[in-house]
Amino acid sequence: MNYNAKRVMRQNSVCVGSNDMAASPIMIGPAPPSAPSTPQLQTTEDIKPLLVQRQVILLQSGSIPTNPSPQQINLAGHNVAGGASGSNVANVLIPDDAPVSLLTEIADIMRSFGDSDQPRTGSVKLVEQILQQQLRGIFNEASLVAMRRKQNPCPSQADFEFLMRNHPVKIARMRKHLKDMRILKRFLSIRTGRPQDFMDDLEQQEEDEELAIDVYELHDEDRMRRLFRADRISQILTGQQYLEFNEARKTSFYCRHGEKIKNKFRRFLDLPADLRIPTPTMNILAYLAHETIAAIVDYSILTRLNSDNRATEPYSRVTSAGGSPAMMHVCPEVTQGRGMEVVKPISVPEIHEAMRRFRQMSSRKIGRYRNSCDIDFRRSFLAI
């Protein structure tokens, strides 16, 4: 090897001493943000909420351990607490802004609408991604409608009802739900002795005056089908299973755990921090989240009924109620494997197929095909 080759090798090499290594801290921090990409499914370890913290360790020697042991981290913390001025060991905790996950609540809501008592992790995560996209799209559309008003650009109940103007049954269902929630809130405030928030009542009265669509109480087929399905499911459960099923039916994004779940739901939507959203609007978004999950479960069960994998024994679909065979034409998805067999959880391909059919039916007109290039094209949402 000649002299020029050795010189190039010496220039490309870097020699770091132990003293320089001890004097210069090595920051173990988050990686630089990369370009946005398509959302990827997480692993099964992301179901449990974890508090992720990063450690910043100043090394004393030239040897750099790739995975420091907990004893070394604790030792570093004790040295910093001792207040030694010449110490080169420090321990700094940096909280990680991990994305908020609602896997537990979504799994309970899916179970309450007819899924298995142990939903698949991949299915729940896929529903979570669809839910976030749907809710952010609905809020964006409602904001565009609200921006036409100069005095109050914040979305209100009238804006969401304007988006649902072609579905009066859904408008009546949402109004009935919000009315029941106001009655329940007043009852709980009287029972617990807590003072009521009169500002919310004033905002609600202003919204009631803005509602220009007169919707009468109509026959809600979807709601009756869900109630019938829940009734048939409850008839074949044991005592402990019924208690768990009842708790799952109580799950929501605004009642359970109070302000904690409300703040978690707002962080899940990833809305701007400086955006002021009134409480009635957040209640409507929470209701639409509940309806979106219900629609996904409904379409997934109907997709399973229309697919070829519906291979079950006819007598195993008969429940303990004597009228089940006679009611199969009313709600056939109640008997999708229940009875002698174990209920099969909703799979990811069934959800994809259900969403494909929904988008195909919602993006077509009678007589001609409509694509995204049309002027009157609007994004399809499950809840509205």
Curated annotation (Swiss-Prot):
A GO MF term: transcription coactivator activity
CDD domains recorded: HFD_TAF13 (cd07978)
UniProt xrefs under Pfam families: TFIID-18kDa
InterPro entries named in the record: Histone-fold (IPR009072), TFIID_TAF13 (IPR003195)
Signal peptide: none
Subcellular location(s) of the protein: Nucleus; Chromosome
Gene Ontology process terms (BP): transcription by RNA polymerase II
UniProt keyword terms in alphabetical order: Chromosome, Nucleus, Transcription, Transcription regulation
Gene Ontology, cellular component aspect: histone acetyltransferase complex; nucleus; SAGA complex
Null mutant phenotype: RNAi-mediated knockdown in female germ line cells results in arrested oogenesis at stage 6-7.
PANTHER family hit by this protein: TRANSCRIPTION INITIATION FACTOR TFIID/SUPT3-RELATED, TRANSCRIPTION INITIATION PROTEIN SPT3 HOMOLOG
Subunit structure: Component of the Spt-Ada-Gcn5 acetyltransferase (SAGA) complex consisting of wda/Taf5L, Saf6, Taf9, Taf10b, Taf12, Ada1, Spt3, Spt7, Spt20, Sf3b3, Sf3b5, Nipped-A/Tra1, a histone acetyltransferase (HAT) module made up of Gcn5, Ada2b (Isoform B), Ada3 and Sgf29, and a deubiquitinase (DUB) module made up of not/nonstop, Sgf11 and e(y)2 tethered to SAGA by Atxn7. Taf5 and Taf10, which has partially redundant properties with Taf10b, may also be part of this complex.
Described purpose of this protein according to its UniProt entry: Component of the transcription regulatory complex SAGA, a multiprotein complex that activates transcription by remodeling chromatin and mediating histone acetylation and deubiquitination. The SAGA complex predominantly acetylates histone H3. Required for oogenesis; involved in transcriptional activation.
Family: Belongs to the SPT3 family.
Name of protein: SAGA complex subunit Spt3
Gene source species: Drosophila melanogaster (Fruit fly)
Source taxonomy: Eukaryota, Metazoa, Ecdysozoa, Arthropoda, Hexapoda
